[in-house]
Amino acid sequence: MGRLKDKFNESIKPALVKEFDIKNPMLVPALEKIVISVGAGDFAKDQKVLQNMADTISLIAGQKAVITNAKKSVAGFKVREGFPVGIKVTLRKEQMYAFLDKLISIALPRVKDFRGLPKNGFDGRGNYNFGLSEQLMFPEVEYDKILRTHGMNITIATTAKNDKEAFKLLELFGLPFAKGK
């Protein structure tokens, strides 16, 4: 098992049971999935750049990324149905814990002037969203092989009922939140 999965079972789960006075062990908040997504934006027309972005996300996640296509045509955005609009990868189980461990212990400490993740990324249902401005903080990414730098959105879905439980869960995992508000 992964380091964070062991940490969850040995120390985080009992701490959450104690703090939130949970009687049923199946109701303890846990990680459900992590979704990494990138909007293609202006690069959607260039197939080479789009494939390079997908390969980069696949390297970071350790799982093949999927190019997502538009479901409907939107004239205002100059998008046609079936047009590539982004890239995503969904991580569950062991790969999810491995990615979170890499994010917390390697990638985020390499961000220049990092002050912590914003606390306002919770959606009210126990899920947390945040964005990273570039992909170069991950050790798998080689600067020479990148055609364009791009950011990414990371969504951490939990089984928590509310933001307070989700915040405590992610804080116990070691996600560095910004001090203050």
From Swiss-Prot:
GO terms for molecular function: rRNA binding; structural constituent of ribosome; tRNA binding. It holds the Pfam family Ribosomal_L5_C. Keywords: Ribonucleoprotein, Ribosomal protein, RNA-binding, rRNA-binding, tRNA-binding. The keyword RNA-binding applies. The keyword rRNA-binding applies. GO terms for biological process: translation. One of its GO terms (cellular component) is ribonucleoprotein complex. InterPro entries: Ribosomal_uL5 (IPR002132), Ribosomal_uL5_bac-type (IPR020930), Ribosomal_uL5_C (IPR031309), Ribosomal_uL5_CS (IPR020929), Ribosomal_uL5_dom_sf (IPR022803), Ribosomal_uL5_N (IPR031310). This is one of the proteins that bind and probably mediate the attachment of the 5S RNA into the large ribosomal subunit, where it forms part of the central protuberance. In the 70S ribosome it contacts protein S13 of the 30S subunit (bridge B1b), connecting the 2 subunits; this bridge is implicated in subunit movement. Contacts the P site tRNA; the 5S rRNA and some of its associated proteins might help stabilize positioning of ribosome-bound tRNAs. Part of the 50S ribosomal subunit; part of the 5S rRNA/L5/L18/L25 subcomplex. Contacts the 5S rRNA and the P site tRNA. Forms a bridge to the 30S subunit in the 70S ribosome. Belongs to the universal ribosomal protein uL5 family. NCBIfam families: PRK00010.1. This is Large ribosomal subunit protein uL5. It comes from Campylobacter curvus (strain 525.92). The lineage of its organism: Bacteria, Pseudomonadati, Campylobacterota, Epsilonproteobacteria, Campylobacterales.
